[in-house]
Structure formats: C-alpha cells, structure tokens
C-alpha cells in the first residue's frame, strides 16, 4: 500500500511579518504603559490591607443608594432610546450598498466623531453646557451610543441577502419600500440585540459619567471614594454589580426571544 504524505501548510511571509509586528508593538508598548508586574507582587500585602478596608459593606443608606441607582437606569434608558431612534437613519445612510458614496462617506465620518469621543468627555462638555444633573448624562450617552449603533447597523445592512430586496424592487417598489420591506426585516433582530447590549453598557457608563456631575449613583460613588468611605464604596459597587448582572440575565432572555 502506498503511503501518501501530506506536506504541512507553508507559513506565508505576510503571516510571519504580521506576528512580528504584533510582537514589536507589545515590546514597545511595555515601557510606555509602565508595566510593573513585579511591583504588583511586591506590594501585594499593602493591597490586601487596602482591600480589607472595604469590608463589611455599609448598606445603612440603602434607600438613597436605590434611588440613585434608579436615576442611573433612567439615564441609560433615555440615552439608549434616543440613540436607537437616531441610529436607524444614520445607520442606513452609512451603508455602502444603499446610498452613493457622497452620502455614506460624510455620514460615516460624523458617526466616527461621535464614537471616537468617550462618554466621560461628552459628559464633562454637557455639564458645562446644560449644567449639573442627569440630563447631561443622557446627552453624553445619546451622542456616543448613536455613533456605535450606527456603525453596527451599517455593517449589518451591508451583509444582508440581496434576494429579498431585488424581489421587492422587481415589483416596482420605490427606494423607501425596499428599505421598509426588504432591508429592515433582515436587520431588525440584530438591531434589537445590539440595542440591548448597548443598554447594559450604558448602565455602566452612566455610573461613570455621574462622577463628573452627570447625575445618578456615580455622584454618590465618587463622594464615597473621595471621602475614603470604603465600606460605603463597597456597598455601592455591590449594588452596581448586582444591577448589571440582572440586566445581563434579562437582556439575554430577550435576545433569545427576538433572534
């Protein structure tokens, strides 16, 4: 019986070069990032002492914590809802297979700008513009999330099956009808999934933007940290973790229902 030997696949020079570039970037970034793993191990005792100050959590003001957590959720709800509404037209206008280049290129750059700036930066700007409070947080999440969802929606639109759209076009439908009956039904499950995920992310982001005065539990958390009230800080962190975990569970069930 003749033995057939299969030669191993040859590594392309491009693949080897790519790995070399990745390794070089990691090496160069080591110094810039001031990586110090040995210091982390050396100061482990101090970190353990610091961590012990967080226990037991102080839930004595739990009613105030729940009130601020509710405000944080409301900030995330409105920031996400407004972004979902606006991301649909912007996402469609960012899709290369729906509109000409002179439409999608400017819209993409606008969405890049919304996405490139962190929510914290937007929150600081809106705190100056509209004052302290939850509304500044809503606007910050709204702008950033619009950029993210528009990007995700445009990629989903560009990956749709052209058959249904062509079939609707063959009936004499106009462009709007093609989008309503051929495009949106294909991407709507993904849009719902992306929106639920961004809502989870926005709850966490709403906590952070609160630290710069944009309302919610972030304000209380920052005051506890700044006042070295670590047991209260731990209680607030536990509440945030439990809330995000519950939202993750609920959104997972909803995603299974829609997809």
UniProtKB/Swiss-Prot annotation:
Kindly name one Pfam family recorded for this protein.
Answer: BPD_transp_1
Q: Which GO terms describe its cellular component?
A: plasma membrane
* MF (Gene Ontology): ABC-type phosphonate transporter activity
Q: Which InterPro entries match?
A: MetI-like, MetI-like_sf, PhnE/PtxC
Location relative to the cell: Cell inner membrane
Gene3D superfamilies reported in the protein's UniProt record? MetI-like
What superkingdom heads the lineage? Bacteria
Q: Where is the signal peptide?
A: none
Family annotation (CDD domains): TM_PBP2
Keywords assigned: Cell inner membrane, Cell membrane, Membrane, Transmembrane, Transmembrane helix, Transport
Record membrane topology? Multi-pass membrane protein
Which positions fall inside the ABC transmembrane type-1 domain?
69-251
Which regions span the lipid bilayer? 13-33, 75-95, 123-143, 176-196, 205-225, 230-250
Q: By its UniProt entry, which NCBIfam families does this protein fall under?
A: PhnE
- Family statement drawn from the similarity comment of this UniProt entry: Belongs to the binding-protein-dependent transport system permease family.
Purpose: Part of the binding-protein-dependent transport system for phosphonates; probably responsible for the translocation of the substrate across the membrane.
What does the record note on quaternary structure?
Answer: The complex is composed of two ATP-binding proteins (PhnC), two transmembrane proteins (PhnE) and a solute-binding protein (PhnD).
Q: What is the protein named? A: Phosphonate transport system permease protein PhnE
Q: From which source organism is this entry?
A: Escherichia coli (strain B / BL21-DE3)
């Amino acid at each position: 019986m003749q033995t057939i030997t299969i030669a191993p696949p040859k590594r392309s020079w491009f693949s080897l070069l790519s790995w070399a570039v990745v390794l070089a970037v990691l090496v160069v970034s080591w110094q810039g990032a001031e990586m110090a793993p040995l210091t982390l191990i050396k100061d482990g005792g101090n970190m353990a002492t610091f961590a012990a100050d967080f226990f037991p959590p102080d839930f004595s003001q739990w009613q105030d914590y729940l009130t601020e957590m509710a405000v944080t959720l409301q900030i995330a709800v409105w920031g996400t809802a407004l972004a979902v509404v606006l991301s649909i037209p912007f996402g469609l206008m960012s899709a290369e297979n729906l509109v000409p280049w002179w439409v999608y290129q400017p819209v993409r750059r606008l969405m890049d700008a919304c996405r490139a700036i962190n929510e914290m930066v937007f929150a600081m700007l809106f705190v100056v513009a509209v004052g302290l409070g939850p509304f500044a947080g809503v606007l910050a999440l709204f702008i950033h999330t619009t950029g993210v969802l528009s990007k995700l929606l445009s990629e989903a639109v560009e990956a749709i099956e052209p058959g249904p759209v062509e079939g609707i076009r063959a009936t004499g439908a106009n462009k709007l009808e093609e989008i309503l009956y051929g495009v949106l039904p294909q991407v709507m499950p993904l849009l719902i999934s992306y929106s639920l995920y961004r809502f989870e992310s926005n709850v966490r982001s709403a906590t952070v933007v609160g630290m710069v005065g944009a309302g919610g539990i972030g304000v209380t958390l920052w005051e506890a940290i700044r006042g070295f009230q670590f047991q209260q800080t731990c209680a607030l962190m536990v509440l945030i973790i439990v809330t995000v975990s519950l939202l993750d569970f609920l959104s997972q069930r909803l995603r299974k229902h829609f997809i």
